[in-house]
Amino acid sequence: MKKLWISAGLVTTQGHTAVEVKEAIRLLHSKTIQEAGCIRFEVLQHQDEPNKFTLWEEWTSEAALQAHYDAPHTQAYFALSLTDVSYIEKLEQIA
């Protein structure tokens, strides 16, 4: 089964702060890395634009990624509406 890589950009929504996002996303991270299909889940904050974040993710399969999206902790993060998704790239490792 092919692994799935994700690169996603998040931007803090109006009325929220990067501090709020970091607190919530750290909780999301702590639960996500325990998911069976999660190989890697890295959260990075842009140095020059602190209201922007990048997620680097590696999943065992598309089904594992979907299970992550459906997980209660992911849905709870989405419900906070702290960030908007600026892009999502599904990637395949070639070397």
Where are these regions (language model features)?
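Glycine-rich beta-strand-turn "strand-cap" elements at beta-sheet edges
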Residues: K2-L4, V43-E49, Y77-A95
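Short, glycine- and small/hydrophobic-rich beta-strand elements in well-ordered beta-sheets
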Residues: S30-K52
